Amino acid sequence: MAIRNYKPTTPGRRGSSVADFAEITRSNPEKSLLRPLSKSGGRNNQGRITTRHIGGGHKRQYRVIDFRRNDKDGVNAKVAHIEYDPNRTARIALLHFLDGTKRYILAPAGLKQGNIVESGAGADIKPGNNLPLCNIPTGTVVHAIELKPGGGAKLARSAGSSVRLVAKDGPYAQLRLPSGEVRNVDARCRATIGEVGNAEQSNINWGKAGRMRWKGVRPTVRGVAMNPIDHPHGGGEGKTSGGRHPVSPWGQKEGRTRHPNKESDKLIVRRRNAGKKRK
């Protein structure tokens, strides 16, 4: 993938860029793997906003991705196409199995149309192949990792992300996550070799608010720009800094939201680099 920069023909085009989609080999998705996808607008079943800044955007259909890959062990598959998926930053690969089945998987970097991929404990160590962590050599870069055996991939699924297998210790495999955290995961969990493709996705400059609206992202209004009835930072004579530590519209302090005594903390070998703390 490469980034194509626009010429500044309009204010919205100035500085904006777009992916060139050179790796895409087919524009029409596999119909048997499509599902309807309705929009919530960030509302719950009572019509109340539960997640702000969501609404509108282009209509989409969901592509069913195989995140488990545990029922085709030993069955080779050919990469028929690399496709665009509007529901994620990564590209997806359409696999045609020898038994006639068709599946979508996340397309790792380097996977091309016509390649052969496989899954199972005896699979080769090459991009796109899926194996249990206990069968993967230490030092290998992987993505789409399960947290529970058979539970489906949960870690490293977005464009350009990857995890390194740094050690094996009894029933556990130690993984270094993109955040820097080193974590134990059950060695029976599966992972896919390589890193997720489309790594330059993060370098795209969207250029104008309208392109974000096409994605279904609504504006984020600063609290200091609101009235005091709407936000704790609102009001004041002239422009102000808010006058207190940053909080949400409901007074919740900004910072870490993860519970400090989570059950899975015992699996963390080394913490990630510390972020903002709540005061």
Curated annotation (Swiss-Prot):
Residues forming coiled coils: none
Gene Ontology cellular component list: large ribosomal subunit
Any GO BP: cytoplasmic translation
Keyword Ribosomal protein belongs to the record: yes
Residue spans of biased composition, Basic and acidic residues class: 253-268
Region called Disordered, residue ranges: 29-53, 224-279
Pfam families membership: Ribosomal_L2, Ribosomal_L2_C
Entry superkingdom: Bacteria
Start-end of Basic residues biased regions: 269-279
GO molecular function: rRNA binding; structural constituent of ribosome; transferase activity
Alphabetically ordered keywords of this record: Ribonucleoprotein, Ribosomal protein, RNA-binding, rRNA-binding
Protein family (similarity comment): Belongs to the universal ribosomal protein uL2 family.
Assembly behavior: Part of the 50S ribosomal subunit. Forms a bridge to the 30S subunit in the 70S ribosome.
HAMAP family on file: Ribosomal_uL2_B
Protein name in UniProt: Large ribosomal subunit protein uL2
